[in-house]
Amino acid sequence: MNRSARRRLTAAVLTVVAVTASATACSSDADDTSTKAEGGGTYTIWDPYPQFEKGSAWAKLLDGCGTEAGVKIKRTAFDTSDLANKALLAAQQDNSADVLIVDNPVVSTLAEAGVLTTTEDNKLDTSKVSPNLLAAGQSGGKTYGTPIGANTLALYYNKAVLKKAGVDISSVTDWKSLTAAMAKVKKAGKKGITFSAIGTEEGSFQFLPWFWGSGAKLTELDSSQAVSALSLWKKWLDKGYAPNSVINNTQTTSWQEFASGDYAFAENGTWQLANAEKAGFEYGVIPVPGASGGDAAAPTGGEFVTIPVQGDTGRYATSQKLVSCLTNSENLLETDTTLSYVAPTTEVQDKQVAADAKLKPWVDAVKAAKGRTSDDLGTKYPKISEQMWKAVQSALSGSASPKDALGSAQSAVK
């Protein structure tokens, strides 16, 4: 590996730390599992699912794909934030995994560091993948993997709270009607909405649906549309529709507030579905509305299945077989159900909704979703995101107006 490539990898290690800060996966020690197959050698797969131990459906799927390809699989599972750095260090040592399943925002960082091969290189078929989801794995006009599934944000609502306030959820179609619903809820003695505005990537993740829903672009943090989005959040705090605790809320603590039964709405993700079923009250889900109606684009979460660069190019053909097996329609349905993900293809999404009608609003939200590193932002995104969450913190705490906070953010990005 030449010196310029090593410099790119070293810089990428620093970038990855910022991008993976919003990871919500469970932490765990690495878990190695392997399965035997006739001949063909051993192929390594790294994934961010330490919660799935040896003997789990996920581990069995990996084993099965290895058997189908005629090779032995050695699997290592890491916490999401650890995995990206491990992948970069392995690349520096020319010891990359054969297949790497990684959080979608860091794909562009790994790609620009020269760690990943393109789908064109390895003839991976991504033709059925929804373009908005595939975009999260694209950089410089090239695609560096295929999504295994996606999660995103939407609005959970408490049916009893809205009924008591006389709010028909079908009337909530834009920011004006959503705010009006919160006013009725407050008048009825309950609370409007909870979300996470914490000063980390998690806060940016939660702000993005409102930012994009205003028509704003990440290259113009100080646009009038962006100011309107931050002003909306500030108004909710000033009116008492949202609690001051949102400034420090993570998505977990925000959910705990909603689970108390006192709130009409909560912005949260598909990963809370199991908790929603245990909340003890009837709930519903709607996509985050755009400023003037329609569904706002929410940021996509979820992982990409990628093939890292290898010194032995003869390994790519088998790696391609493994990735194709992991992401075929039959296996995607099982895997995405296990992960509480929405599938990346319309074909499998339809099957998910047919099996569970409650997934429909999530499928709709994913169809409107957008990758944080899309629009060729790539490694520029972490710096933009940091200035965004700082602006949100500044405005909501009252230390600066939304306009001034975003103006400072844009100046810092340039």
Model-found features: residue ranges?
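Conserved N-terminal structural module of periplasmic/extracytoplasmic solute-binding proteins
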Residues: N2-V107, G290-S292, G314, T318, ...
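Extracytoplasmic "Venus flytrap"/periplasmic binding protein-like
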Residues: G66-P131, K163-G166, A264-F265, N275-A276, ...
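Short helix-initiation/N-cap motifs at beta->coil->alpha
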Residues: A77-K86, P105, T173-T179, S245-A259
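Hinge/lid segment of periplasmic solute-binding proteins
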Residues: D103-T152, T179, Q206, I286, ...
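Periplasmic solute-binding protein
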Residues: L110-V115, L133-S170, I198-L218, T300-P308, ...
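Extracytoplasmic/periplasmic substrate-recognition and gating elements
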Residues: A165, D238-A242, E277-L339
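Glycine-centered hinge/linker elements that transmit conformational signals in sensory
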Residues: M182-K186, T219-I247
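Long, aromatic- and glycine/proline-rich binding clefts that accommodate carbohydrate-like moieties
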Residues: T337-Q387
